[in-house]
Each structure stands twice: as C-alpha cells, then as structure tokens.
C-alpha cells in the first residue's frame, strides 16, 4: 500500500534555485523513493513570474514522475502553504545596486513576516520549514517569530551549503574522499562570518586536524575560501550558486525527515542557550537527526580561537536581529 502523499510548498519556485530543486524533489531524492509528493509552488503575483511558473509546471508534467501526485501554482502564501508538511522558503529579495544590508533586511522582513503568518494559520502543525533565501538565518528568525502557534523548532535555516563546501575543501586538502569525512561543524550565520570547524572531524577514525596539521591554511585559506565561496561563484558564473544551493536544501530536508544515520550535519536552528549563543537566535550548530527530529551535538570544547569565531558570527546575527526588531511588532 502506498504512503499518503506529503505536501511540499516551495517559494520562489520559478527562480534558478527552484528550477534546480523541483525535479529532484519530484523524483524522490528528498523524501524517499517510496514517498508520493504534492508540490505547492509559490511565486510573486507578477504576470511574468506566474507565466514562468506555468512553464516549470509544464516541464514537471512532462517528466511523468511516478511519485508526483499533483502540482499547483500559487501567488498567495495562504493557499501555497495549506496543510504543507515541508516548506522550502527559497524566494527572497536579492540585494540590488546601491542597496544597504539594512534595506535588504527590511524588504525581506516584510516577505518573511507574511509567510510566517501564513504558515502559522494554514500549514500542518508539524511543518518542517527550511529557509534558503538570504539572509537565511534572520529570515528564518522573522518567520519563526511571526508564527507563534507553531513550535520554534520547526524553523531552520540552511547552513548545509557551507557544510558541503567545507567538506569538499577538506577532501581536496587531505586527499581523502568526501564521504569518509565525519564530524565537521559549521557554526553561526550563513554569511562570510560563518566558522567552518574541523577540530572534531575524523577520517576512518583518525583526526583530520592532525592529518592536515596546518594552522595557517585553516586560518588564511580554508575559512576565507568557504566564507567567500558564494561570491567566487558569482564572479565566475555571473549568477549566484543555484544548483549547489538546491542540492544542499535536498540534503538538509532529507536528513531531517529520513535521519542522518548518526552522522553530524549542520543546521541553523533556534538556540537553546548552549555554546554561549542567546536563546532563540537561529544559529548553525552540529546536529544528528532521527525520526524526523534533530538533536544538537552537545558538550563540544570551544577553544579561544573558536570562541572568537563563534562570537564574531553571533555579533552579526545580533545586529541583524536588532535591525528587524521594530518590524516584528
């Protein structure tokens, strides 16, 4: 007997990331090869965007995915999020020429306040929300604060792209396979301030830090390369990273829903006060996932260099939070 279909809402569905994401969800890569899905796709109520969305839906139809039960197009979050089991909030206002970061925050605060309220009112009470649209941590915080009837733990931000970028750099440096590297952590904000930390990482039970044994590389090459990778891709491609972001979103939700099999993964989640991070801030931490729940890895030692890096990315998150405080009243 087949499982009941899961409803997956995706915002910004006709955008670059959406285009790289939807076909993989429909093929079963995110929720499992035996899990039927209904896609509820949201785009802005603009004729051009809605027309583009219709084209994407035509292509989804033309793939004849056995797991794809239904696809609907929406311009209103209140219909797009109806009974959603998973919500991928991909659409956000990008930073335009001459726009200050605070302008970006206030424009996105309006979008994510409205989407948080809609989730609060119409989504499944167990909805799993992943915010991909930047600034992802603060957008997730805004949505969470706008949805008081939903558990705060349902709201997460995507740090998995940073995690995967760090994995790939470490594999290249150490000559080891990506799949063999375990216990990598990325702390903080999804921004260049984030702190990729391989002090606990292992390869085949051996310490990766001891194997690499290069503090200067860690400080001067590894951390900045991971932090500025998005900008490097824009510089090379002329467009932001879409396929790798979509891939990270698939990884994040797949592990959250189906479990990480004991492996550490990075998720931006509401802080419980551990690691000196104020409660409620959406901050990247290591977690393991099982039975649809994530559990933070606790008790990791924070040395002086790491404390400095954790506080540096926290400072940015607190500034962002304070920048949107008045908009959340």
From Swiss-Prot:
Sequence positions that bind substrate: 95, 101, 134, 165
Active site per UniProt: 190
Keyword Transmembrane: no
GO MF annotation, one: L-malate dehydrogenase (NAD+) activity
GO biological process: malate metabolic process; tricarboxylic acid cycle
Keyword annotations: NAD, Oxidoreductase, Tricarboxylic acid cycle
Top enzyme class: oxidoreductase
SUPFAM superfamilies in alphabetical order: LDH C-terminal domain-like, NAD(P)-binding Rossmann-fold domains
Keyword Oxidoreductase: yes
Annotated residues for binding of NAD(+): 12-18, 108, 115, 132-134
InterPro entries according to UniProt: L-lactate/malate_DH (IPR001557), Lactate/malate_DH_C (IPR022383), Lactate/malate_DH_N (IPR001236), Lactate_DH/Glyco_Ohase_4_C (IPR015955), Malate_DH_type2 (IPR010945), NAD(P)-bd_dom_sf (IPR036291)
Catalytic activity as recorded in UniProt: (S)-malate + NAD(+) = oxaloacetate + NADH + H(+)
Gene3D superfamilies attached to this UniProt entry: Lactate dehydrogenase/glycoside hydrolase, family 4, C-terminal, NAD(P)-binding Rossmann-like Domain
EC number: 1.1.1.37
Physiological role: Catalyzes the reversible oxidation of malate to oxaloacetate.
Family: Belongs to the LDH/MDH superfamily. MDH type 2 family.
NCBIfam families registered for this protein in UniProt: MalateDH-SF1 (TIGR01759), PRK05442.1 (NF003916)
Protein name from the UniProt record: Malate dehydrogenase
Source species: Bordetella petrii (strain ATCC BAA-461 / DSM 12804 / CCUG 43448)
